[in-house]
Regions:
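C-terminal segments of enzyme domains that contribute to small-molecule binding surfaces
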Residues: 57-101, 133-204
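Conserved catalytic segment of ABC-fold P-loop ATPases
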Residues: 108-109, 124-126
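HATPase_c (GHKL) ATP-binding subdomain of two-component histidine kinases
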Residues: 95, 121, 130
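Flexible, glycine/small-residue-enriched loop-and-beta-strand segment within the central core
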Residues: 3-105
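Conserved catalytic-core motifs of eukaryotic protein kinase domains, centered on the activation segment
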Residues: 46, 123, 139-140
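Non-catalytic N-terminal targeting/anchoring module and adjacent flexible stem/linker
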Residues: 1, 108, 202-204
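A generic "structured core" feature
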Residues: 94, 108, 112-114, 118
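Acidic, glycine-centered active-site loop in nucleotide-sugar glycosyltransferases
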Residues: 125, 130-133
């Protein structure tokens, strides 16, 4: 989307006003208004744990070719999916330095991941997690406020139309004002433009 920054050396799906400063491998979905620090990484490929070996010899086609060329024998392979899906990062997510994310997990809206954490499971919305493996330390707000924020989805609006920023640390004021603005029709969702950079560069 417009007003976003693309991760270093990679094309990804990045929402408006998100600023990843790290190098992600492969396409990854990042929501709006995210702050992602340097050296955040995604775990490498999987290996089978329930086979006699974790080695790639049981599923990598090169080992069948090698067996035929060197030993004049065939080597039966059993399929194994080594690369999981990339993580999905929600909106208003803050990820600290040197965090490692497991593939296929979902980071909920408003979540915070402390620096040096290793995240192996989904992170609920507005949870603050830390550690190896990462565990929930606390939530940013109480459950009622979280439910309201997830319903309001403030990141879908132009930030300059949001309630008085001088009171941005009063979450109850923010929720009440957003509900008032929405119910009165005084705030409209922002239609951010989307760009496909691979198509743009291909057409140059």
């Amino acid at each position: 989307e417009e007003y976003s920054t693309m991760p270093v050396k990679n094309f990804s799906s990045v929402g408006a006003f998100s600023f990843p400063t790290c190098h992600f491998t492969g396409n990854i979905h990042i929501g709006r208004f995210c702050s992602i620090a340097s050296n955040v990484k995604i775990m490498g490929g999987n290996h089978p744990l329930n086979r006699f070996t974790t080695h790639m010899m049981t599923y990598n086609g090169e080992f069948d070719k090698f067996a035929k060329s060197e030993f004049e024998r065939s080597w039966t392979l059993k399929p194994f999916i080594t690369k999981p899906e990339n993580p999905i990062i929600g909106n208003d997510v803050w990820i600290g330095n040197d965090v490692v994310l497991k593939g296929g997990i979902a980071i909920g809206d408003g979540a915070v991941i402390a620096a040096n954490s290793v995240v192996t499971k989904d992170v609920p919305p507005y949870a603050i997690v830390a550690g190896v493996p990462a565990k929930i330390i606390r939530f940013r707000f109480d459950s009622n406020v979280i439910d309201e924020l997830l319903r309001i989805k403030w990141w879908n609006y132009n930030y300059s139309d949001l309630p008085d920023n001088n009171k941005c640390d009063d979450i109850n004021y923010f929720v009440e004002e957003m509900n008032r603005l929405i119910s009165n029709g005084n705030i409209q969702e922002m239609d951010y433009k989307k760009f496909n950079l691979s198509e743009i560069f291909r057409d140059l």
